[in-house]
């Protein structure tokens, strides 16, 4: 009846007894594997929920709506339309269609909407560049995986730099791996800061760090140990995060995120 806690009652050391021991071992191993799978699925669900929570923080939404109201009062109608459209696309791609994956092309469309809003809020202090290799567009990623990395670059690199700076996103194929980099020419990070950025305990106190830790966790759940996320930084010069991932191809089902 599917009861994995059942055990055979044979106690003899005969061949039948050995068979009974093998049966017990097989049942115990099966139960262990099922428990491990359940734990993994639960961890995956929790990670995905945290990811959705991290995408659109209330303060970001409030600030964006405040900016829209302020621009409307100032008669900057074209900018109101642009920011409202970007926010609508951002919300739509965050809610999505129930899938837990996106093509890189859709991920970049989501990030572009986010950057459009942030650039309008910070004016000339924030610039961005996106260089996407066409051969990487249909590569699959866990959904909403790039925004936390871009957000971290803005808030810990560009925002705190007096003259602002540029966020650059790039993708390319290298042998059998997909490489994605998010780089900023902001204030950089010290070796001590780099050590804490992927530390769960340290991340619990700060939303952007929670997002970065969650990115790494979800990459491991999706790709396994072949997924690598590395941070490089020079204080006062730049910070770069590099994702080195297995290539998993998907289909571009629709283009709504880029209308």
What are these model-predicted stretches?
Residues 1-56, 60-232, 238-244:
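Two-component histidine phosphotransfer core
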Residues 26, 248-252:
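Short, charged/polar, Gly/Pro-enriched secondary-structure boundary elements
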Residues 253-259:
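Intrinsically disordered, low-complexity acidic/proline-/asparagine-rich linker or regulatory tail/stalk regions
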């Amino acid at each position: 009846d599917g009861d994995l806690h059942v055990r055979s009652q044979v106690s003899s050391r005969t061949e039948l007894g050995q068979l009974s021991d093998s049966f017990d071992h097989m049942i115990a191993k099966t139960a262990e594997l099922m428990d491990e799978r359940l734990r993994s699925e639960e961890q995956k669900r929790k990670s995905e929920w945290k990811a959705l929570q991290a995408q659109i923080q209330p303060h970001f939404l409030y600030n964006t709506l405040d900016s829209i109201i302020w621009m409307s009062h100032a008669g900057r109608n074209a900018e109101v339309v642009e920011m409202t459209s970007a926010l609508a696309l951002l919300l739509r791609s965050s809610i999505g269609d129930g899938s837990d994956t996106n093509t890189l092309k859709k991920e970049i469309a989501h990030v572009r909407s986010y950057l459009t809003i942030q650039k309008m809020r910070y004016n000339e202090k924030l610039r961005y560049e996106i260089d996407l290799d066409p051969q990487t567009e249909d590569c699959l990623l866990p959904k909403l995986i790039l925004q936390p990395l871009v957000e971290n670059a803005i808030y810990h690199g560009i925002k705190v730099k007096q003259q602002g700076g540029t966020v650059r996103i790039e993708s390319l194929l290298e042998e059998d791996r997909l490489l994605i980099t998010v780089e900023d020419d902001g204030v950089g990070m010290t070796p001590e800061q780099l050590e804490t950025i992927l530390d769960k305990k340290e991340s619990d106190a700060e939303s952007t760090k929670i997002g970065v830790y969650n990115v790494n966790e979800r990459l491991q759940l999706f790709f396994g140990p072949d997924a690598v996320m590395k941070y490089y930084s020079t204080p006062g010069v730049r910070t770069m995060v590099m994702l080195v991932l297995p290539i998993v191809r998907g289909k571009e089902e629709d283009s709504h995120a880029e209308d």
